[in-house]
Amino acid sequence: MRTVLALMNRNRKLFFKDKGMLFTSMITPVILIVLYATFLAKVFRDSFTAAIPDMITISDELINGTVAAQLTASLMAVSCITVTFCVNLTMVQDKANGTRKDFNVSPVSRGKIYLGYFLSTVANSLMVNGLAFVLCLGYLFKMGWYMNTADVLWVLFDMILLVLFGSTLSSIISFPLTTQGQLSAVGTIVSAGYGFICGAYMPISNFGSGLQKVLSYLPSTYATSLIKNHMLHGVFREMERKHYPGEMVEAIRDTLDCNPVFHGNVVSVNQMIGIMIGSIAVFGIIYYLVILLSKGEGRR
């Protein structure tokens, strides 16, 4: 275990030593929240107000708080996954600059080497996304704050789950890559496409029924819905306190993807947590098997 921790710390130091990569990773959440607030806030606001009956009046503060909570939840859902591909660059860099050849002739097992990469990816991703979460809380405080301490802690738990999910996924995808250009290309594809697939840029409820059924099989759908449920929990609590019709509140929950459906059944929050834990376990096993089955790497 001491060897694994030493490798993890070595990878983390390399991440902090690369000022360009560190700056890019740290500035990404700031850029995302500005872009989301600029281009997606109106889309989210229109989607929310469309579910409100004409005879119901909702204060601008509650509307702004709802839109801000949906926006920040979407940002965190994307950031927790895409950032892992950026901070996982060390694994590819070691192959590109020949450092892995030194590791391969050392007495350290391949499993420990790759576990060190994985743990450093998790640690660095949590740091970057922790900054993103602080920025999101500041934005929520400005636009409309309805969260309590329990809601904040649940979102932190969601963030850890999503970072673990993203780290296992990025480790599997990055494993066969040998150049920084390849990882940059993969990172670009993931950054551009993941937000649409997970329902962050546009609620999945706005998609066609066929596409909704396809996306219901992807864990990313439930990852986004999970963090939305906890980010928006205070908003729905405020709506219930003001005695808004239950049908309207449920319609809003459906519109914002807080009630994902799988084969006609609504997936509960506890089930979403189970899906994420199961997905992390499955991808972790796949990553372990990929390491075991890689042929000849240690002899090259």
Regions found by a protein language model. Give the residues of each.
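Aromatic- and glycine-rich beta-strand/loop motifs that create alpha-glucan
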Residues: 1-32, 97-98, 112, 295-297
